[in-house]
Regions:
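Active-site environment of non-heme Fe oxygenases that use a 2-His-1-carboxylate facial triad
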Residues: 1-243
Length: 243
């Protein structure tokens, strides 16, 4: 049921998981292996000094996908809440496919621009002396012309290098999408509890966070990535056992 919810709806929250450090490994290994990145596995979502990512602060985060500057961004993300007794810090989720479907039906010209315009995503990582760059459209389709990916993160948008004649059209469409992705009609707001595993399709569901007061208590999540192939492979196997 967990994998079905992830595959068909893009989001699922597991309740009452153990809250021991790194215990997410014991749960996720029942699906498959996790995907390693320069953030390490698990990555610690906690307020730390000298962070190399805004997630490692107490600041609010705009709705985004993770690692848009990778050629293939992680397919799924799992955020395991170990403790959350700080004031604020509510989580936000948005079904990006629902938003771009709304955009397509109500603002077709903007949709077309975002489908066809390549965008520069950049990550400058001082901790590994690396600059990661990727050019991809914000919206991509699969071989059936169904939505395959939404690639969106304000924090990692690079300077646009498209033709000047395209610039105004692109930014007009981009602002429209940005507004919709933070429209309360499409947002789900919730507070993570210790033992929750917030699981979602990282290339469909955008996530964000409200600001929290790091002096009021602790908020510690551990994050894991997994490729789409692993989720689909395990789901195919299970469904074949129970046709």
């Amino acid at each position: 049921k967990w994998l079905q919810q992830l595959h068909y709806f893009g989001i699922s929250i597991v309740k009452n998981a153990p809250t021991d450090v790194n215990s997410g490994f014991d749960i996720l290994k029942n699906i498959s292996h996790t995907r390693e990145t320069f953030f390490k596995t698990p990555f610690e979502v906690i307020d730390i000094p000298n962070p190399n990512n805004s997630a490692y602060t107490a600041a609010g985060l705009r709705n985004h996908i993770d690692l848009p500057y990778y050629e293939i961004a992680p397919g799924y993300q799992f955020l395991h809440c170990l403790i959350n007794n700080a004031t604020g810090g509510e989580s936000v989720a948005v079904d990006g496919f629902k938003v771009i479907d709304y955009l397509k039906n109500n603002h077709p010209n903007d949709y077309d621009v975002l489908l066809k315009t390549s965008v520069k995503f950049v990550n400058r990582d001082y901790t590994t002396n690396t600059i990661r760059v990727m050019h991809k459209p914000i919206i991509t389709l699969d071989h059936n012309n169904d939505y395959n990916d939404i690639r969106f993160s304000v924090a990692y948008m690079g300077v646009m290098d498209c033709h000047p004649d395209q610039m105004d059209h692109f930014y007009s469409a981009y602002r429209k999408l940005l507004s919709l992705l933070h429209d309360q009609r499409f947002e789900i707001n919730f507070r993570m509890q210790a033992g929750d595993i917030f699981s979602f399709n990282n290339r469909r569901v955008l996530h964000g966070r409200k600001e929290y007061d790091a002096n009021s208590g602790e908020r510690h999540l551990q994050g894991y990535y997994m490729d789409r192939d692993e989720i689909l492979g395990r789901l195919n196997y299970i469904e074949n056992l129970n046709p």
